[in-house]
């Protein structure tokens, strides 16, 4: 039987791996041991203890957060119950009794306004919408002839308008939507003074920020369509030191206020901004008869300065006497 002898040049395999590998591992272990053996400072020890305590209290913090949420929920519920009388209008609306009265903003003057005034009209419409939503007796709100620059501006700057509730936004003219006998156009050039509001009627406010460029336009439009027209009884109750200009939203809010109170004077003085310097007309009469003679015959719901009082074509010409100042109702700045 023959035996084989390994050549002298062949060495047994190194079962411990490559040379130097074990040395490297030993060095790393030694470094870790040395690091653990090094004493830590009081600050580090305090930090470690704080971290450990934080981890131990994790569940307790969860429970505290749950309790806090429950407590806040209960507080909100109690607050709502305590405000059940309607004082908190943001959370609880007062008793709402919708009115049948239709209030229309006529937007058919789009091509007569520059973009700056279109934006102002848009803001005034936003205010009207917000006030109607909060009102005790909200009206049936219409925007008619909606399109052109106004619609484009609303699309670009107020995309939420498409989700507005309790409003009728129509591209058609108001005369196509409502019977002629039900329409009443509000304009300061009308010789008719409004004494009361008829909830079966539809009152039209001209949506035009004009700066006195188109005098008498709304009155002419009402006459051409053969519809009724009237002015609010502003001069009977109010004397203003400033220019007698009411924004679209002012006219809208005055009507909302009158529906709630049934009192024109209260409606005017609740809505008119302080900067107008408004005082009751009877007091102005007592203090200055001359000022009383200068009181205008009304206001203009559509544009600034429809028919000056000296205009030959003004329907106020026969009534004006010593009146010389014109009145308008749409301010270029929304309130």
From Swiss-Prot:
EC assignment: 2.1.1.221
Basic and acidic residues bias: start-end ranges: 52-62, 304-319
Domain SAM-dependent MTase TRM10-type: 88-279
Subunit structure of this chain's protein: Interacts with tRNA.
BP terms from Gene Ontology: magnesium ion homeostasis; tRNA methylation; tRNA N1-guanine methylation
InterPro entries: MT_TRM10-typ, MT_TRM10-typ_sf, TRM10/TRM10A, tRNA_m1G_MeTrfase_euk, tRNA_MeTrfase_TRMD/TRM10
GO CC, any one term: nucleus
GO molecular function per UniProt: tRNA (guanosine(9)-N1)-methyltransferase activity; tRNA binding
Coiled coil: 52-84
Family annotation (Pfam families): tRNA_m1G_MT (PF01746)
Ranges of compositional bias, category Basic residues: 63-75
Role of this protein: S-adenosyl-L-methionine-dependent guanine N(1)-methyltransferase that catalyzes the formation of N(1)-methylguanine at position 9 (m1G9) in tRNAs. Probably not able to catalyze formation of N(1)-methyladenine at position 9 (m1A9) in tRNAs.
Expression sites by tissue: Ubiquitously expressed. Is more abundant in brain and pancreatic islets compared to other tissues (at protein level).
Compositionally biased intervals (Low complexity): 320-335
Name of the gene: Trmt10a
Similarity remark: Belongs to the class IV-like SAM-binding methyltransferase superfamily. TRM10 family.
Phosphoserine carried by residues: 22, 24, 331
Protein name listed in UniProt: tRNA methyltransferase 10 homolog A
Annotated localization: Nucleus; Nucleus, Nucleolus
Species: Rattus norvegicus (Rat)
Keywords assigned: Coiled coil, Methyltransferase, Nucleus, Phosphoprotein, S-adenosyl-L-methionine, Transferase
Residue span of region Disordered: 1-91, 279-335
Reactions it catalyzes: guanosine(9) in tRNA + S-adenosyl-L-methionine = N(1)-methylguanosine(9) in tRNA + S-adenosyl-L-homocysteine + H(+)
């Amino acid at each position: 039987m023959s035996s084989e002898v390994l050549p002298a040049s062949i060495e047994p395999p190194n079962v411990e791996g490559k040379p130097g590998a074990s040395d490297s591992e030993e060095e790393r272990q030694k470094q870790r041991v040395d690091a653990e053996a090094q004493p830590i400072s009081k600050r580090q020890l305090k930090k470690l203890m704080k971290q450990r305590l934080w981890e131990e209290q994790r569940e307790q913090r969860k429970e505290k957060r749950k309790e806090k949420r429950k407590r806040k929920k209960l507080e909100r519920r109690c607050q709502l119950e305590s405000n059940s009388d309607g004082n908190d209008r943001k959370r609880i609306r007062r008793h709402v009794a919708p009115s049948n009265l239709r209030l229309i903003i006529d937007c058919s003057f789009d091509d007569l306004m520059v973009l700056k005034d279109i934006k102002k009209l848009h803001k005034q419409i936003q205010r009207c919408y917000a006030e109607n939503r909060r009102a005790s007796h909200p009206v049936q709100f219409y925007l008619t002839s909606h399109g052109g620059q106004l619609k484009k501006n609303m699309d670009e700057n107020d995309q939420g308008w498409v989700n507005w509730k309790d409003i009728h936004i129509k591209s058609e003219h108001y005369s196509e939507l409502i019977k002629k006998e039900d329409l009443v156009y509000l304009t300061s050039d009308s010789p008719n003074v409004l004494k009361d509001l008829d909830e079966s009627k539809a009152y039209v406010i001209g949506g035009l920020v004009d700066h006195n460029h188109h005098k008498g336009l709304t009155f002419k439009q009402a006459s051409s369509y053969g519809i009724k027209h009237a002015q609010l009884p502003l001069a009977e109750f109010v004397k203003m030191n400033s220019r007698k200009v009411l924004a679209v939203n002012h006219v809208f809010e005055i009507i909302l206020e009158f529906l709630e109170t049934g009192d024109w004077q209260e409606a005017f003085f609740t809505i008119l901004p302080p900067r107008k310097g408004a005082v009751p007309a009877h007091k102005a009469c007592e203090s200055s008869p001359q000022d009383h003679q200068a009181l205008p015959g009304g206001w203009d719901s559509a544009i600034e300065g429809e028919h000056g009082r000296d205009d030959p074509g003004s329907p106020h010409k026969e009534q004006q006497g010593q009146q010389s100042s014109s009145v308008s109702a749409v301010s270029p700045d929304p309130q």
